[in-house]
Amino acid sequence: MSRLLRASILLLALASCGGGNSSAPQNMDDACAILRQRPAYFKAMRATERKWGVPVHVQMAAIYQESKFIGNARTPHQFALGVIPMGRQSSAYGYSQALDGTWDEYQQEQRRFGAKRDRINDATDFMGWYMSQSSAKLGISLNDAESQYLAYHEGRTGFANKSYLEKPWLVDVAAAIGRRSAMYAGQLSYCR
């Protein structure tokens, strides 16, 4: 086999290893199963919990809602007249679905210029940073997955202005996140 062909095969094999997972864990309703299937998730979330104080179960519930644990998740495309692509709904990307502007702010403030939204350790650190600021600025408990999610989704100004009250669907989503966080907390107490 020629050197060029061998090099091409090696390059293709390495490229397929990728940074973030592009598929969801098999059982997203079982925190222990998720962490057994993806041990790097637990390592990243524990590091975030130690650094920022955000419990693993709160991080898991938020990531479930934002990306279903898919590292390269993006918002859907928008179409004009149902067929003409007009770009994506927002710049949200990765596990945390962080917007470009908020991600840039995080990178600047934390001096993490190499951080990537499709790497679980960077995404959980971002969430920890954001949620700890929400706790400091808005008085939201780091254990309150429901309120933390509302502040995460609406932004801290939107949360302070209670913009979520005009979005009953979002209040329902946040309540579901609160329930999922409690479910994950119960499960994690048995498998850690």
Per-range role (PLM):
Residues 2-10:
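Sec-dependent signal peptide recognition
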Residues 10-11, 25:
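Residue-level signal for mature regions of secreted extracellular proteins and peptides
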Residues 13-16:
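C-terminal motif of bacterial Sec signal peptides marking the signal peptidase cleavage site
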Residues 21-192:
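Catalytic glycan-binding domains that act on GlcNAc-containing polysaccharides
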